[in-house]
């Protein structure tokens, strides 16, 4: 638990929603305390909070109280809010939704805090999205086996594998036919582990693998950010391979 009072804590605004006629409930991803829910009293109308509590805003937040909802007592800018539009905006909401769905409140993950900001600034780069997904699962204790196969042998870049989500990659003796399970090349696994650049044919393979892995923990409830992307994709400018709709 974070205690009764926390002062000037670096945090990102993930989400906001109305609470009473004048206040807001704000979901923050803080550096040292993890995901925090807080009530910003007067947040819907007061000039005090204007422009500070929008999603993707980096803030220095101060709050007090215990329990599920703290009381936000102050916030000030902590840098520029990334200028996201089109597919980059939809991808940003996808990142936020992953954190809201997968992180428990008051569960610190300081290693993810700077990675989140770096990923926002790289959107809509698909390799950045896959990297964030992979590091998020690792932080939660659900990391994928990427450097060794099921038999304990090192993964080889030119080899082909069938990935079993509960056990890891199974090396295949021959190039497999499409539709024979979750197929991936060793190069893609090494790229997700950070050993190679994630590009070219590895991108769709990584997308399929990460989508399957995340689905184990997201459950059956659809991601709202995918619906947002479908709306944005109706205009040609918004269409991009990095869309959350492809996850």
From Swiss-Prot:
Task: Kindly indicate whether the keyword Hydrolase belongs to this entry.
Answer: no
Write out the transmembrane intervals. none
Q: Which gene encodes it?
A: recO
This chain belongs to the protein called DNA repair protein RecO
Q: Record's superkingdom?
A: Bacteria
Gene3D superfamilies per UniProt: Nucleic acid-binding proteins, Recombination protein O, C-terminal domain
InterPro entries, sorted: DNA_rep/recomb_RecO_N, NA-bd_OB-fold, RecO, RecO_C
| Sorted UniProt keywords | DNA damage, DNA recombination, DNA repair
Q: What is the lineage of its organism?
A: Bacteria, Pseudomonadati, Pseudomonadota, Gammaproteobacteria, Chromatiales
Q: What does this protein do?
A: Involved in DNA repair and RecF pathway recombination.
What are the annotated GO cellular component locations? Answer: bacterial nucleoid
Q: Which family does it belong to?
A: Belongs to the RecO family.
GO biological process terms, alphabetically, are: DNA recombination; double-strand break repair
């Amino acid at each position: 638990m974070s205690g009764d009072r926390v002062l000037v804590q670096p945090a990102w605004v993930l989400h906001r929603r109305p609470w009473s006629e004048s206040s807001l409930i704000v979901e923050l991803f803080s550096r040292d305390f993890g995901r925090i829910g807080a009530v910003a009293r007067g947040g819907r109308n007061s000039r005090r909070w204007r422009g500070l509590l929008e999603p993707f805003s980096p803030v220095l937040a101060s709050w007090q109280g215990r329990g599920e909802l703290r009381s936000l007592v102050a916030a000030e800018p902590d840098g520029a809010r990334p200028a996201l539009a089109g597919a980059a905006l939809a991808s940003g909401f996808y990142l936020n939704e992953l954190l809201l769905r997968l992180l428990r409140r008051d569960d610190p993950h300081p290693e993810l805090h700077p990675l989140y900001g770096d990923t926002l600034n790289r959107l809509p780069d698909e390799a950045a999205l896959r990297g964030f997904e992979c590091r998020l699962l690792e932080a939660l204790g659900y990391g994928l086996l990427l450097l060794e196969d099921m038999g304990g042998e090192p993964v080889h870049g030119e080899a082909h594998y069938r990935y079993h989500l509960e056990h890891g990659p199974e090396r295949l003796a021959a190039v497999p036919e499409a539709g024979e399970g979750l197929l991936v090349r060793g190069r893609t696994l090494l790229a997700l582990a950070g050993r190679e650049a994630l590009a070219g044919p590895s991108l769709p393979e990584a997308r399929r693998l990460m989508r399957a892995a995340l689905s184990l923990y997201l459950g059956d409830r659809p991601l709202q950010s995918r619906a947002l992307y479908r709306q944005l994709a109706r205009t040609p400018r918004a269409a991009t391979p990095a869309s959350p709709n492809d996850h």
